[in-house]
Amino acid sequence: AGRSIDFRTVPLFIEYTTDRAGRTVRDFAEALSDCVREADSARRGRLHAAAVFACNFSNHLYAIAGKLLEKEGLDFGILGPLVLETAAKAVATDNPAAVQTGPAVRGDTVTMRRHEAILARENDERYNKIYKLLSESIWETSKRT
């Protein structure tokens, strides 16, 4: 919130019904962004769902991490270098699953059980559910990549 965004770098996805409307919409979009693509409503819907996973959900996980750190007297900023490196690796590849790390991808059940025990002592039972669901998804995905 409150950050300035260089709109030229933001991809815009356009849809139109006539060639004339298409020219108008494309001209306007190209005046705003260097990345303009055509996409119908269904494709934009899938794109939006992907953005929610990549941005909204990851930010929520940052918030959970922040709460866990706060209980130890630490600021979320301590994870900054790790978060930035992880994001940089993910966007530098066409297959973020290929650069996935952590106990789930390694099948390190000892570490995962230890984490689950820690999370079980938290005031929010959803933390363990989220941890288990994501770990299972990471493990299953890692077997396919």
Describe the residue ranges of each PLM region:
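Internal alpha-helical scaffold of NAD(P)-dependent oxidoreductase catalytic cores
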Residues: 1-92
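Interdomain hinge/lid region at the active-site interface
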Residues: 70, 81-145
